[in-house]
Amino acid sequence: MLSYDKSAQPLGHIYKAQQQGYLPRVYCDETRPLLEGARLTAYELTRVGIDVTLTCDNMAASLMAGGKIDFVFVGCDRIAANGDIANKIGTNGMAIIAKYYKVPVYVFAPTSTIDLDCKSGDDMDIEDRPAFEVTDMYYAKPMAPKGVRVYNPAVDITPASLITGIVTENGILKPREIRNLKKNR
């Protein structure tokens, strides 16, 4: 499996699988620019004895092409009524690659992240993050020329069409089923 981001939701499910005797192997993307995957997810999984291999974000396609990934799992910040999600920048690209290689993508999120008033990802605001996160943050010296413009959005929108299922505390939903929750609330 391949992890992309730092969400606690999927980690809980991995811990539970391990407790039930499954021995998951997790490829953990570094998750730039803040390196949450390297600093947090890999740390947490290693701490409880899960087999973790840290990878650069750009290695996902290579892993999938080589048949090393059974599924991708991510958390998310927000889910729109149509099943689009907002999550850490790079999630959309990861999901596009996964679809190409026929690797399922699961979003692990509590139902509290569902915003039924938000029709689609087009209605979500995307925060711009500071340039230093890309140019300076984890480097002894700045790694980019002084004054270079930086594009650093915090999240991107992954369309529902790229998502296999949304794992909530109430079970697994297809993205198209999110809209129906309104009728049941």
Kindly give the residue locations of the regions a language model identified.
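Gly/Ser/Thr-rich loops at beta-strand to alpha-helix junctions
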Residues: M1-P10, L34
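Extended Lys/Arg-rich, glycine-bearing segments that form polyanion-binding/interaction patches
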Residues: Q19, R25-T31
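Histidine-anchored nucleotide/phosphate-binding helix
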Residues: S7-Q20, A95
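Conserved phosphate- and dinucleotide-binding cores of soluble alpha/beta proteins
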Residues: D29-R185
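Short helix-capping segments at alpha-helix termini
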Residues: Q19-Y22, R47-G49
